[in-house]
């Protein structure tokens, strides 16, 4: 069997892995990149998650037809996928293997592409295999048809007239909002007492109101009895009642993708969720083997994968001062209509942790730029430590929230008191200037 040795092997073409491959390739190191699926060059974000779904949301907001939305998705993902492949393929020090990679020992990976096989060995190995959708544990889910995960539904054609969504987390609600924009009648099945249970009460209330205004039916406190088919239609049985749709999306979370990569042939340790256990530099239980991105069980965001790159690159080049224990204040955005951005603690979280807090809420309808935009939906809230005026958390639910939340993060990271925003000079009319009023208390 053919064999080849590399300085660095990357298993999985994700954000952290591809960036490490490009960096070390540019330094003259011999690098191998292994990716099983040519439609995944570049990783989850640009192919099946952040980029395609947000592209679809923007396209739908412009009034494009369903087929046009799908086409725009393909145009954008193809462009970025080809760019990412070219970034490595044109590097003379990087070999890209399109095939299935599986460990056969701690530092050897067998790569299979059809009838072709090769064993690659490496001084350093990076595991960047991402995460996969979790299929819900519901009676009938393994045999019923027309039930889709968040990847599969992005290719669904023709457009369903009715769509059931199992799960009311960020993925489920983003797709609910998207399909409602496109004219599909959407029903969301939520096992909790309300949607967005981790968010501030004002957000839960407003989001429920806005989603309902979009024509979305939200069923809370449901017990999912089973799923089945009535002819060629998928059926959800919940609380003893049957609901029939053209298609059903299950959005019940994602888990680390560590199956079928040969970890049983190594000394690499995984936890109860299947995530690879790592230390503060993302190194696994095998020295020289690192796990980055979703596969190590951290927050499932592409910017966290990029941060893993920073940590591993520093560790491998002798500048490992920044580690996982230094990471803090991770913001996130759920792309509802309007977008919902959060960082840090809610008021309830902060009180439960023993903080004495002071807070302020503002409705977007009171903000000048919102009137210019003719879009008055949403609210801001900030939670402050009353003992030292440092920001504990913030929620921004508005147009532009996905951008503004990063200002809050920088203040939190640098221990800047909330009063800094009260006295800051912002341009006018902007959404950012409302941080003056939000922090004036």
Question: Which ranges hold each PLM region?
Answer:
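Beta1/beta-strand and adjacent pyrophosphate-binding region of the FAD-binding site
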Residues: 2-14, 159-169
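N-terminal Rossmann-like dinucleotide/flavin-binding domain of flavoprotein oxidoreductases
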Residues: 3-4, 44-121, 199-225, 347-349, ...
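Flexible, glycine-rich terminal cap/loop adjacent to redox cofactors
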Residues: 11-39, 44-46, 51, 56, ...
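Residue-level detector of alpha-helix initiation sites
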Residues: 14-19, 40, 45, 133, ...
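Rossmann-like dinucleotide-binding cores of NAD(P)H-dependent redox enzymes
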Residues: 42, 75-85, 154-155, 160-164, ...
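A Rossmann-like FAD-binding core segment of flavoenzymes
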Residues: 95-97, 102-115, 120, 183-280
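FAD-site-proximal beta/loop scaffold in flavoenzymes
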Residues: 143-158, 242-319
